[in-house]
Amino acid sequence: MADTAPQLKRKREQEAEEAETPSTEEKEAGVGNGTSAPVRLPFSGFRVQKVLRESARDKIIFLHGKVNEDSGDTHGEDAVVILEKTPFQVEHVAQLLTGSPELKLQFSNDIYSTYNLFPPRHLSDIKTTVVYPATEKHLQKYMRQDLRLIRETGDDYRTITLPYLESQSLSIQWVYNILDKKAEADRIVFENPDPSDGFVLIPDLKWNQQQLDDLYLIAICHRRGIRSLRDLTPEHLPLLRNILREGQEAILKRYQVTGDRLRVYLHYLPSYYHLHVHFTALGFEAPGSGVERAHLLAQVIENLECDPKHYQQRTLTFALRTDDPLLQLLQKAQQERN
């Protein structure tokens, strides 16, 4: 792919999501900028405790392991490692078949044959995301869970969801590190520095920047105190319009992808509570892009133009894990209303 930055590392959670995929939420594991120099994992040893989740379709596996067991702590420390096969790079894929590739025949029948092909090192990298040290919350986050849909009224948000969120220790220091250029400054694709209506645009962890099919960037607003969709009012329209227009323009300039080939949306519930907007390739089924979580930014802007209190009053539907305490609280309120 032309005019793309080299693959770099970054830690956010993701989360995700969805992530819903390790999302930009995995950032909690560190704030250092990416580097092309040889690096080491931030721990020694890795003894697998449990496979938290795996997907043959997505070529990804989430592992819980014990590390640093040789440091004198007999119990070691917890870490989560996410291993993901990277997508093919179209401009390099022909190299897999030139010369004498290393092959192992699986079967042959008439015109059909299947092989295991062992690619050269530069075409066989595995994206590795590390969460270390990992807490019980991280282990639960990455473990496969059953989901349930729940409808949250405006009153539910004010009396249940918001107090619950405020009671949790949800650090977003990694977000401030990006905004303050303490981490990942070299990864910023575009910035509007206005403290009220500006933002930074940065590649999401789920995109390795080697092809456009799964393009994924995040716009993070400079203004602090806007937690989610629920906080938005007409006061924030200049910010939202800037993100939509300038974000699309920056992506067109850098990646030659036009606005009508982008899906631009917010999550609710978000994976972290500092306003951010997702930019993904329209043909990419990104985690969290389903109707129960994604809200198109253009529609959000129009809703606020029509009704200043739209997101304070509207009932919003989203999915929660069955073991999420917030689900129990909202279900109880729903039962009492019925």
From Swiss-Prot:
Broad class of enzyme this protein falls into: hydrolase
Motif (nuclear export sequence (NES)): 141-153
Family matches, as InterPro entries: DcpS/DCS2, Histidine_triad_CS, HIT-like_sf, Scavenger_mRNA_decap_enz_N
Alphabetical keyword list: Acetylation, Cytoplasm, Hydrolase, mRNA processing, mRNA splicing, Nucleus, Phosphoprotein
GO annotation, cellular component aspect: cytoplasm; cytosol; mitochondrion; nucleoplasm; nucleus
Gene3D superfamilies linked to this entry: HIT-like, Scavenger mRNA decapping enzyme, N-terminal domain
Ranges where the record places region Disordered: 1-36
SUPFAM superfamilies noted in UniProt: HIT-like (SSF54197), mRNA decapping enzyme DcpS N-terminal domain (SSF102860)
Catalytic residues, chain numbering: 276
GO BP of this protein: deadenylation-dependent decapping of nuclear-transcribed mRNA; mRNA cis splicing, via spliceosome
PTM sites of type Phosphoserine: 23, 100
Main location: cytoplasm
Localisation per UniProt entry: Cytoplasm; Nucleus
E.C. number(s) listed in UniProt: 3.6.1.59
Positions contributing to substrate binding: 174, 184, 204, 206, 267-278
Pfam family, one: DcpS_C
Record-listed N-acetylalanine modification sites: 2
Motif (Histidine triad motif): 274-278
GO molecular function: 5'-(N(7)-methyl 5'-triphosphoguanosine)-[mRNA] diphosphatase activity; identical protein binding; RNA 7-methylguanosine cap binding
Keyword Transferase: no
PANTHER family to which the protein is assigned, alphabetical: HISTIDINE TRIAD HIT PROTEIN MEMBER (PTHR12978), M7GPPPX DIPHOSPHATASE (PTHR12978:SF0)
Subunit structure and binding partners: Homodimer. Associates with components of the exosome multienzyme ribonuclease complex, such as EXOSC3 and EXOSC4. Interacts with NDOR1.
Role summary: Decapping scavenger enzyme that catalyzes the cleavage of a residual cap structure following the degradation of mRNAs by the 3'->5' exosome-mediated mRNA decay pathway. Hydrolyzes cap analog structures like 7-methylguanosine nucleoside triphosphate (m7GpppG) with up to 10 nucleotide substrates (small capped oligoribonucleotides) and specifically releases 5'-phosphorylated RNA fragments and 7-methylguanosine monophosphate (m7GMP). Cleaves cap analog structures like tri-methyl guanosine nucleoside triphosphate (m3(2,2,7)GpppG) with very poor efficiency.
Family: Belongs to the HIT family.
Domain comment quoted from the record: The C-terminal histidine triad (HIT) motif and the N-terminal domain are required for the decapping activity. The N-terminus is necessary but not sufficient for binding cap structures.
Protein name: m7GpppX diphosphatase
Organism: Mus musculus (Mouse)
